[in-house]
Each structure stands twice: as C-alpha cells, then as structure tokens.
C-alpha cells in the first residue's frame, strides 16, 4: 500500500484485521506503507527500523499480533492454548528491540489482560477478542498521553524561561508523530509551543548514523510549518555557546527509577553541553517508558547495531564511505545520568528532584496511582 497523496503523518495505519506501517527508512524522499500480516512481520519491521520510536514500537508490535489473531481461521486450541500462544508471541516481539521498555511494558500489560480473560473464557476466540481490544486501546491512549505531555511541557518551559513569550529549543532524534501513535513526546512539546505562538525556533540534530533528525524530525517540522533549523550533531555545543536555545528537550527509550535515561546515542553529549552552558535539559516521555525495576541506568541493556550503519551512507542503506578494514562501535543508545536532567515530563505531570541529583519516580508513580484510585 502506498501512502502517496496522503498529507497526514501517520506511522501506524490500523483498522481491525489490517495494519500498515510507514517505512521510515524511505523518508523523506518516498512515502510507502508496508502491509503487516502477523507478529513475524511486526518483529522484522521493528528490528529493521521500518518503525522506530519507543511508543510506536510497542503499539506496532501489539497490533501486528492483533491482526494475526483477527485473521485466524479455525484455531483448534482451547482458551488456555490461546493464552499460551499469545504469551509466546509477545515474548518473541519483545526481543526485537530490547532497550525500549515500552515494548516490554505493553507485552506485560497484554499478558495481564488475557490472563484475566481466561478466568471466564470458555473458548479461544474470547481470549483473542480481549487481546485485540486491549491492543486497540493502547493505540488510542497513546495520542491522549502525548497531548498531555505536550501541555505539561509547555507550562514547564514557560515557567523556567527568561522570556516565556519567545522560546527556542533543541531536540534530538525523532519523537513526533512518526515515533508514536500521533502528536509526539518531546516533539509534542515543541508542537504545543508552536500552537500557542511562543516558539521562536526549533533546532533539530541530524542524529547520526541513522539520521532520524534530518530525515524524520525535519520532515515533520516542515510538514507542520514549524520554524526550524537542522544542525550537525557536532554543532550543538556551538549553538548553545551562541545563546541560541533556551532549553533542550529529548525523548526516552527507558528511564530507570532514579531518572537515569537511555535514549538515542548522542543524548548524553547534549546533556553535558547543556549543563556546561547553564541550559535546562528535559526528558519528555510517557510513564510506560519508566522501568521501576531498575535502580539506575547501569542496569539498562544498550543495544548495539550493525557496523554497516556507520560504514555506508543513509544509515547503512547506501554506498560505502568508510575505509575497508576499520572496526566499528555502533551503540544505538547512551545513558544520561539523572544529575544532568532538569525534569522529566510525563502525561501525569512533571517529575522533579527532591533536593539531590536523582529523581524518586517510584514515589511519583505511587502518588499518581493513589490519586487515580480515589
């Protein structure tokens, strides 16, 4: 399916029994949607970077399995067999991108849904129905969550800015509609600033080696007619020294309970530069990106990707540019310590520090849970 002629930026196009993912490897030159028929297609699309961005990965994985079971014809097993089938498929999908906690979190929540359904189900189709409905809810909930992040981020940046009516911000990688179900996290905050008429300029890094900034974020910013400038990754420090930005805002693939954050490679460098220049550095992410089982970022598994992404143009898809025989180290993410982060913007509010260098996200989560249960 081709997306040509459709001006709406959507990474995920879904209806019951059908899923297409925008092939982000082709952007911004081609807009092509790939048909995803089952969990195997979903795994490959995630692993091969057809779809990327922690929230979008989780939703695409869940829906790929939803499409598979929707189109089942004559599953012979029992309700218990259906649960076992889904659990095995979810474990398989989680292996596609181990650093992004949203994917593992979504799988765990879906396992809870089908386990609960098993208590009353008499046949497999009841289990599959419960799974499909829960997956579809995740798609809808992500957009609502992103808009809340945008609004909280808007308020925070205005409160802490020297001139709250004119703000310029720097972002890294891609955290917009293409990385989520819609609207975006860090880019959603930028979108909210623009909507309110107080964004002077958004700066985005190219984000090598896969160029998510130059290919995807720049594409979204131009599409939304947001005033924006693309910079080389290595120009960020000079940009800050010149006083061109009021804040740096990035997304997250996994946040430990103390606030240490794993995000696209280069994030740590930006945080260090921001600290040196006295510029606030923010993380914008849904609470599904937080892994409370991890006490610090030292426990986060950092994915390493193919050397080809550095040795060839276009993130490994183009012609060779590196000298034959050179060794390559290509981590996809790095870990930014909490001490460099000014605040973590979530859909439930902004997490701040309690007078030390780290965050107490567990207490924040408990407070939110307590308030929502009243």
Curated annotation (Swiss-Prot):
The modification N-acetylserine is found at residue 2. Pathway: Amino-acid biosynthesis; L-methionine biosynthesis via salvage pathway; L-methionine from S-methyl-5-thio-alpha-D-ribose 1-phosphate: step 1/6. PANTHER family: METHYLTHIORIBOSE-1-PHOSPHATE ISOMERASE. Pfam families: IF-2B (PF01008). The lineage of its organism: Eukaryota, Viridiplantae, Streptophyta, Embryophyta, Tracheophyta. It is an enzyme of class 5 (isomerase). NCBIfam families: eIF-2B_rel, PRK05720.1, salvage_mtnA. The active site is at 253 (proton donor). It is found in: Cytoplasm; Nucleus. The record marks 173 as: Transition state stabilizer. Its EC number is 5.3.1.23. This is Methylthioribose-1-phosphate isomerase. Belongs to the eIF-2B alpha/beta/delta subunits family. MtnA subfamily. One of its GO terms (cellular component) is nucleus. Catalyzes the interconversion of methylthioribose-1-phosphate (MTR-1-P) into methylthioribulose-1-phosphate (MTRu-1-P). GO terms for molecular function: S-methyl-5-thioribose-1-phosphate isomerase activity. Keywords: Acetylation, Amino-acid biosynthesis, Cytoplasm, Isomerase, Methionine biosynthesis, Nucleus. It comes from Arabidopsis thaliana (Mouse-ear cress). GO terms for biological process: L-methionine salvage from methylthioadenosine. It catalyses: 5-(methylsulfanyl)-alpha-D-ribose 1-phosphate = 5-(methylsulfanyl)-D-ribulose 1-phosphate. It comes from the Eukaryota. Gene3D superfamilies: translation initiation factor eif-2b, domain 1, Translation initiation factor eif-2b, domain 2.
